[in-house]
A protein has these predicted regions:
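Short, intrinsically disordered, charge-biased short linear motifs at domain edges
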Residues: 1-3, 31-37
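Short, non-ligating residues that shape and space the ligands of small metal-coordination modules
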Residues: 21-22, 53-56
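Short beta-strand-alpha-helix junction that forms the catalytic/metal-binding core
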Residues: 35-53
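Catalytic-site neighborhood detector that most strongly recognizes the C-terminal catalytic loop/helix
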Residues: 64-70
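C-terminal, charged low-complexity interaction regions
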Residues: 107-112
Length: 112
């Protein structure tokens, strides 16, 4: 976890809060349930509360949910991580990252 904090900083990617070390968790950008692995390229720092709330939802869905509630997730860091994953040696990382990156950069659909 310390290497992750040194690489990305101590702030949660979802809420921006700097949690106590015991509340820091490794956030799988591509969740394990969607083929993600516990590799440095697929990991960002998140507080325990945000990691639990997100569960295994896709990045774009959780970003939109947070923004609708007034949150400010670090979309730049998420895009950068997803872009890096599109070049992964792991096919499932590449495919899911490309799909999530497209959805994250697409304009939000107006409510119907």
């Amino acid at each position: 976890m310390q290497e992750l904090i040194e690489r990305d900083g101590p702030a949660c990617v979802w809420c921006g809060r700097e949690p106590w070390v015991r509340d820091c968790t490794l956030e799988h950008v591509i969740p394990r349930s969607r083929g993600g692995h516990a590799t440095p390229e697929n990991a960002l720092m998140a507080c325990r509360a945000c990691n639990r709330r997100r569960g295994s939802r896709p990045v774009d869905a959780y970003v939109r949910e947070l923004e609708a509630a007034g949150g400010t997730p670090d979309v730049g860091k998420l895009r950068q991580t997803l872009a890096g994953l599109t070049g992964s040696e792991r096919r499932r990382h590449r495919d899911e990252a490309a799909r999530q990156l497209r959805r994250l950069t697409a304009p939000a659909r107006p409510d119907r």
